[in-house]
Amino acid sequence: MHRNELDIFNPHGIDLIENDEGFYQLAVINHSPFESIEMFEIIKTESSWDMIWRGCIRVPDQYYFNDVALKKDGSFYASHMYKRDISMEEWLMNSLFKSISGHVVLWSDNNFNKVDGTDGSGPNGILLDESSGLLYVNYNQGDNLSVYDINQNTKTGSYFIQSPDNIFLKGGSVWLTSLDLQANDFGDCAEKTNCSLPFSIHKLNQKTLKREDKFSFSRTVFGLPTIAVPHDEKIFMGSFHSDRIGYFSEE
C-alpha cells in the first residue's frame, strides 16, 4: 500500500536480514498513523548507509504487534501481544495472573495466520534462527523464553526469566534482558527521565538454554532495558524509558 511522505512513524520492534535476493531488508513494526509493518532496503553509499522505503503491510484489526522476525524468502513472523484496546486494569491482571493474551503469527502469501502452540502472556521479542529452524519468543508477562521448531511445529525448550523483552543472538549465545521487579513496583519511577529499578542481563547457551552468565544492576544511571547487544567486549543496552543508550564491559 502507499504512504503519504509526511506520515509520522511510531516504530516498535525491528528485524534486519540479508534476503534471498542479496538485499539487506529491514522490517519495522509501526503504530502510526495506522498499524503496519514497514519494509525498507538498507544500501551502502560512499559515505554512509541509507534506507529506502519499499512498502508496508497493513495489520488486521485483531492484531497488535510488538516485534517481527524476517525469513529470507520475504515472509515473516510477528508477535501479537494483546488486544489493541486493552485497559491498564486488564494489563495489570495479565501481568499478575500470567493470562493468555496473544500468540505468534506468520505472514505468508499475503495472509496472516496464527502459529499453533504459541499462545502465552504478553508475547514480546521474537528472533528466528532460520539455519536451525528455531524461533525464539519472549513472553514478557509470562516470564519466560520459549523456543519452537518451526519445521516440526513443536516447542523444544523454555527458560524462566522475569519480564523479558527483546532477544539478540551472537556466537552461539542468546542475550536477554530481565526486569527484576513486579508491575506494581514502579511507583513514581516512570515519571523520571531515567528509571533505575533493578534489572539483569542473561547470557544463555543457544542450544541448551543453560545460563552462561548473568549481570545484575540496581540504582544506576540506566534502567528498564529492552535489548542487550554484545560488541567489542562491551554490552550495549536500549531502554523503553531512558534518554540514552547504556553499556557495560562483559569482564
Residue ranges and their predicted role:
Residues 25-27, 75-77, 134-137, 174-176, ...:
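Conserved beta-propeller blade signature
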Residues 161-215:
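Loop/turn-rich, solvent-exposed surfaces of beta-rich toroidal or solenoidal domains
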Residues 28-29, 78-99, 177-196, 247:
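Short, conserved, GDST-rich strand-edge loop motifs in beta-rich repeat architectures
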Residues 2-18, 53, 58-76, 82, ...:
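Beta-rich, blade/repeat-based domains predominating
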